[in-house]
Amino acid sequence: MKYNANTSNQFRAMFFKNATFLKRQKCSLGVQIAIPMALVIVLVILKLWIESQIENNSGPVGDSSGDDIMGSYISYKFDYMQGWFYTINPNNITNIGYKDGYGNGTGLLGGINQYEIYWNGSDLWVPYTVAVESGQKMNDMVLAQKQQLGQSSMGPLTFPIAGIQFNEFNPQNNLIDLTITCEQQIRYAYNNFENNLIYVLSQIQTSFINYLLNGNGVVVKTQISTLPYIYKSQQFDIASLLGGSFFPFALSFVLPLFMYSIVYEKQEKLRDLSLMMGLKMRNYWIMTFIFNFLTYVVIVSVISLICSAAKVSLFVKGSPFALFLLLFLWGLSMVSFAFFLSTFFKRTRAASIFGYFFVMVMVNLNSTLSLFNTSVPVFYYWVPILAFSRGISTLCGLCGNGLCPPLSQYTWDFELSRILFWLFIDTIVYLTLAVYLDKVLPREFGVPSHPLFFIKDLKELFSKKGKYRKLRDGDGINEKTKLINEYTIDGINNDDDDDGLMDEDVKKERDMIVKGEYNPEEMTLIVQGLRKQFPGRPKPALSNLYLSVKKGEVLGYLGPNGAGKTTSISILTGLYTPTSGTAHIAGLDIRYDMDKIHQVIGVVMQFDVLWEDLTCEETILYYTRLKGTPKSIEFESTHNILKEVNLLDVKDRFVKELSGGMKRRLSFAIAMTGESSIIFLDEPTTGLSIETRKDLWGTINELKKNRSIILTTHSMQEADILSDRIAIVSQGKLQCIGTQTHLKQKFGDGYSVRIDIQEDYQNTHNPTDLIKSFSPSATLSETFNGSYVYRLPKDSIISDLYEYLVLNKEQYHLQEWSLSQTSLEDVFLKISANDDTVN
């Protein structure tokens, strides 16, 4: 039963796999949640603490509801004030006078209202006056006092209350003109008043009136208060003001983690295996995008709830829709930008280090530029994290000062509107670049596409594909002539290879396929003139390959490295497209039906490609869902597959806890998902112990009962034991094909006989004459300590040789002998002797 792997099935498979895998990544998940939460919690704590300090240190205020109107009374009382005034008389005006610390005085200043204090062991009348020559002299004296005080934490307060410069004094005209110099630094002011000016004016007014009234004891006292007011809470919000630095970090730290997840699947070849098993590349990008964005949404939602509960202005004032757009578009552009950056990395470590470094540098760069509050060039908006950081910082600054912009303010002239636009553009541009660069940049596994691949795809879409589709009669191979027609349509010349140089069996295989001389119902795989030419390489990686595999057959597909094995399998599994030619798998054409073909093939890669933090059951469930197994039977199908490879008892065990043999069987189980018709085994037992290897051989023999298998291996023993037929490729061409016995007889050098002489006769007897008398063309190939090895031609009759040795055993003192045919390894080495990659 074949299943339909539609988009919804693949979305479901990827979502559950990603969610389960992320849940198991406790460290990664902790970082994703802890860093943003920690930053926001610190921000909220700072907000609450600073607000409490402001509350505790504020003066009388009105009702916060704003319904009551009241007056606030603030009185400056000058009792027990001690200090002095500097007086400056640059015009030598008469009758200015003075007032000393003993209560004596003359002229205008003699009318200052004093009081007595006890100071340094004696009585002192204050305030008193000290005359100085000029304002500059006064300033020098004050600065010297401040410098001296700055070097000592304690000491007597010797600062003047103020400096008074008399510009004009004319009692006859009731005129006085003066300049008052007051202390403005809180550090040097007295603790019982805030404004020296009020006190100085009171004293001057008292002196002036007493002077005019001839000293009648007038005292002027001044009090100040505010007008009535309606109370409003402070307009600034410290959390929003500080949020300009906190929020960009909190909402950007997931970017490196998104990069990590994509690079990890490339590095471990997990994505490649998923593609071979039927995952559509567009579905991979879409689902990865959605999953990463949902992860971001969860983090943003939690942050928003915390900040809303703490009444951070950014989240409770202004336009909720505008804030939603900013956060929403940042999420989209961040995921796209993470995709874009991930295309340049092959290792997770490098991607993570760069990601975190990039985030910190960009956020700090924006914070530095924001201090100058200058406009930025357009290219600034092409980096999403800079655009978002500037947008959120600007919004935080406005809301922090009680100026949250309403939605009506978001016009094109408002920078935040332009930032929203650029984040949308960044999303589209970087997502497009990510998909494009992923196809064309050099990669560790596979060959990149041509930079202009999309032109070829468009050309084929409107030309060849349409023409070909009109000639097709169905999805299966139901007529022998169908292949002949397709062979002609593609323009494949069956004389591409020189018939005189082509092996007879290879030519026979080709003619059988071209002429349709086979039963389509018995065939799982038909390869027709498959060719692959990579750009920039002088020779094709694969040249005019014809091959067939029957149902239930194991084909040993052998060849040296670089011979074309991997290229041909990559084409058959959909990783590459052929330059010319085609192939049919279960009646489906690899050029046009690859989505359906992925549902009927399984792949076991050379090394185990597994998610270490998934269980056996979760691993198989992912691929079962990927291939479209109905939801109602997906668990039943998973358990049946695990049972078939003897892993059902450990279905809940994590992959990282499995032995090497168990992991290999799990890889076989992956290939069996979705009722696979054909399985590609790439070096299935590499690196395993002999016991584990033999156990897996038994598993492979069980698998082939219902499926066809293509086996690639460098173990000739493995190929000899498991294969029904052997195909050897070299220099991109099929060199020979047939059963093991047939190939050994055809390409082997005959037989090898080993004879051991009894120990007492090793120096006196030599069996060479005996072997030569049986076969004159026999040759001695090896001798050592009474042991002789001879090569016999392949037309030798083994039964006659055995009888001949028995008859002459006593005469030649033969102790024992053994016979062996030419090995498959000998055939392989002979076939590949002229391969450039070997030599």
Swiss-Prot record:
Domain ABC transporter, first and last residues per copy: 525-756
Keyword Signal among record annotations: no
Superkingdom field: Eukaryota
SMART domains: AAA
Any one Gene Ontology cellular component term annotated for this protein: membrane
Stretches that traverse the bilayer: 30-50, 238-258, 286-306, 321-341, 352-372, 378-398, 419-439
Subcellular location per the Swiss-Prot or TrEMBL entry: Membrane
GO molecular function: ABC-type transporter activity; ATP binding; ATP hydrolysis activity; ATPase-coupled transmembrane transporter activity; lipid transporter activity
Alphabetically ordered keywords of this record: ATP-binding, Membrane, Nucleotide-binding, Transmembrane, Transmembrane helix, Transport
Pfam families documented for this protein: ABC2_membrane_3, ABC_tran, R1_ABCA1
Annotated InterPro entries: AAA+_ATPase (IPR003593), ABC2_TM (IPR013525), ABC_transporter-like_ATP-bd (IPR003439), ABC_transporter-like_CS (IPR017871), ABCA (IPR026082), P-loop_NTPase (IPR027417), R2_ABCA1-4-like (IPR056264)
Binding site for ATP: 559-566
Residues of the signal peptide: none
Main location group: membrane
GO terms classed as biological process: lipid transport; sorocarp development; sorocarp morphogenesis
Lipid bilayer topology: Multi-pass membrane protein
Family classification: Belongs to the ABC transporter superfamily. ABCA family.
The protein's name: ABC transporter A family member 7
